[in-house]
A protein has these predicted regions:
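Active-site gating/metal-coordination segments in enzymes
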Residues: 56-155
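Divalent metal-dependent hydrolysis catalytic cores, especially in the metallo-beta-lactamase
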Residues: 20, 24-55, 76-83, 108-115
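Catalytic pocket-lining loop regions of alpha/beta-barrel enzymes
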Residues: 109, 121-247
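Short, flexible/disordered intra-domain loops and linkers
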Residues: 16-24, 54-60, 87-93, 147-156, ...
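Active-site neighborhood of phospho(di)ester-bond hydrolases with catalytic His/Asp-centered motifs
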Residues: 2-5, 47-48, 79-81, 111, ...
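Alpha-helical scaffolding within the catalytic cores
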Residues: 26-34, 57-68, 93-98, 157-162, ...
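Active-site-proximal loop/turn and secondary-structure-junction residues that shape catalytic pockets
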Residues: 51, 82-86, 116, 144-146, ...
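Mid-to-C-terminal alpha-helical segments outside catalytic/metal-binding sites
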Residues: 1-44, 241-246, 252-308
Length: 308
């Protein structure tokens, strides 16, 4: 069983930036996402709405996400998404009814948030206050800088993230992005996909050790890169943090059958004995099930649109 905690899919095509094609090479249609499940041995996934305008001009409504889940309740669960600037850019805006509405309809958490604001921004802090109030899981994308990129920006040591981990202990933070996973190492290569051995002192390792409310969303090329750059470190990392790591893909385009993804990587590590069946099961589905409120595999496999 593999449950993917990081999926994006659109019902229809739309505006595409210059140089891109909306044919499952620039975000996936639902059909394309389901094909990726089949190609890469994934049973079910968590849809994350593309809602923050910082990154892409083609955005989604929550209604579109609900429609996708209603069409394929055996294949998808979903998060709600929101933007700290919603509700009139008010740092005292009440997100409660919005959150309650989507929880009542079946949403399991919040994300993926990619607003290009710092953690300490008053609008961000207000939104986190409300997520904490409802004790929800929260997927976030880290950025190294304001402007020219999307994602919550933080310094190399992730000091902003550490502050909110302390301040909001009832949020289960799902860390993601190249900037997040590059900081698994203690060196200064913290953008894109650094190669070579993982040096001691990486902020991500320290924060995973210290804070019970931080989890690692290992999706995208960045998560895979973090696990393939140093095989000896990876053996330790997967075993040591076996209760805190989450399988995901973040397929934003077509990935051919047979190409190495996190799915194939974990299958290979199980086959060669690098990880145990227990570690494999925890990372591939069990940790996600617990964080999304399911006690058993059967519950996770049930249809996900029962409240729409």
């Amino acid at each position: 069983m593999k449950f993917d905690v990081h999926c994006h899919a659109f019902l229809t095509t739309g505006f595409v930036p210059k140089g891109k094609r909306m044919d499952d090479n620039f975000f996936l249609t639902v059909k394309g996402q389901l094909e990726m499940f089949d190609y890469h041995n994934i049973d079910k996934g968590l849809l994350l709405p593309v809602l923050n305008h910082d990154g892409f001009p083609y955005l989604q409504t929550m209604r579109e996400i609900e429609d996708i889940v209603a069409l394929h309740p055996d294949k998808f669960l979903y998060f709600m998404n929101m933007d700290p600037r919603m509700f009139m850019n008010d740092p005292k805006a009440d997100f409660s009814r919005y959150i309650e509405y989507h929880l009542e309809r079946g949403a399991r958490g919040v994300g993926e948030l990619s607003a290009n604001l710092p953690w300490e921004h008053p609008l961000m802090d207000n939104m986190l206050y409300h997520i904490n109030k409802y004790k929800l899981p929260f997927t976030f994308h880290i950025s190294p800088t304001p402007y020219y990129v999307y994602g919550i920006y933080d310094d190399y040591n992730l000091s902003g993230l550490e502050r909110v981990l302390n301040k909001y202990p009832d949020i289960r933070f799902f860390g993601h992005s190249a900037e997040f996973w590059s900081r698994i190492s203690g060196d200064t290569q913290y953008r894109d996909y650094p190669k070579g051995p993982v040096e001691p002192g990486g902020p991500v390792v320290r924060l995973l050790e210290t804070y019970p409310n931080l989890y690692g969303d290992m999706s995208a090329g960045s998560g895979l890169n973090a696990l393939t750059r140093d095989p000896e470190f990876t053996k330790w990392f997967l075993d040591h943090f076996q209760d805190k790591l989450l399988f995901g893909t973040d397929f934003c385009g077509y990935v051919p059958k047979g190409k190495m993804t996190l799915s194939e990587f974990l299958d290979d590590r199980l086959a060669d004995g690098s990880i145990s069946q227990q570690v494999y099961d925890k990372v591939c589905w069990n940790n996600a099930a617990k964080q999304l409120g399911f006690e058993t595999l059967d519950q996770l496999q049930q249809k996900g649109a029962d409240r729409l």
